[in-house]
């Protein structure tokens, strides 16, 4: 209708305002006056209503010059004599004006408002947004009894700049920004080159001495089917495991923070090998990004098999029998869940019961590797922290529980800060925290 609209409001003695519309393409003045008064009557409205009106009529692109015309009274006792006013207030614009004067949306009134002084009053220049033209609202004293001094005292000079961070909505010319995915979690503070020579040399030595299993005096059977192998993973092997997990973890199928549909998150970072797992869907072959879960490195499987053999040797030695495989069945893992706990990480008491019924019925064990900071590990027959027993798992320890102990409740109460070996941190650049690998068979 109009290329650009500038609106002016005159402040009266009752703090009401007079509506002006300014058009660069029209120089007509539309006014209506009562036959009983020499002063033109004007359309009046409360300040709040006109603020609502202002926010619903965004400025339009127009010419550089501004000319004004006035809207006269819409009072039924003094009907407007101008067809232009009737035309302007008819149809869509009149309905919009009537509807929007009662607008309840107050947030949009808080849009950026730029004020500057004029010689005859104070002008509010309302910005519609960055890069948008502005409309003008004049507050002039029109009370004949008011003096010029009182009029000048009403002049204000306020300048507000829109703050996008605090505004409850985006400007008209600002398109919604796409929320970017968080970068992959890196368990290391810097990138190091891979070096698998330690694990490979250890595997060759293990193949040569497979029949001879030396049992450390530090190893112990905690309960039937539950064995702790202290310092089973040598420092060099720990470094190689960290590097391997880091290489897999920074990929799209790597570490993530699992959570529930209600929004709560586990206090750890997780990566799944062999099969994907999360608290909602349990096990599945594909990951959340619709791709196959990474395979378990062969070197990891070799370490698990050797740990189980050493646990069998320990059970046979302490029991005086050769019935270890019945107490702790042999297991070839096809799932590895890698968890990284920060210094504040923890995991509540739970049972590992998402594997197949056959796997659980046979008591196929869970094998857990600990690397980095030590952890206070809890276990018990019930989900009761007060009754649970505890053991400290240090870097290099391997914990195995199967058979009768397969369905025990277990969890991580706390991480002991600054307890990781300095040689491990220096060589692997592992972040402060605990890296835990748990192997199982589905």
Swiss-Prot record:
Task: Name the residue ranges with Polar residues bias.
Answer: 135-144
Cofactors, names only:
Fe(2+)
Summed up, the tissue specificity of this protein is: Expressed at low levels in roots, seedlings and rosette leaves, but barely in cauline leaves, stems, siliques and flowers.
Can you say where in the cell this protein is located?
Answer: Nucleus; Cytoplasm
Question: Which example biological process does GO assign this protein?
Answer: DNA repair
**Record bears the keyword Hydrolase:** no
Q: Could you state a single Gene Ontology molecular function term?
A: DNA N6-methyladenine demethylase activity
Bias category Basic residues: which stretches? 157-167
This entry's comment on the bound cofactor is: Binds 1 Fe(2+) ion per subunit.
What is catalysed by this protein? Answer: an N(6)-methyl-2'-deoxyadenosine in DNA + 2-oxoglutarate + O2 = a 2'-deoxyadenosine in DNA + formaldehyde + succinate + CO2
**Purpose of the protein:** Dioxygenase that catalyzes DNA N(6)-methyladenine (6 mA) demethylation to modulate gene expression and regulate seed germination.
Please state which protein family the record places this protein in.
Belongs to the alkB family.
**In its UniProt entry, what is this protein called?**
DNA N(6)-methyladenine demethylase ALKBH1D
What taxonomic classification does the UniProt entry list for its organism? Answer: Eukaryota, Viridiplantae, Streptophyta, Embryophyta, Tracheophyta
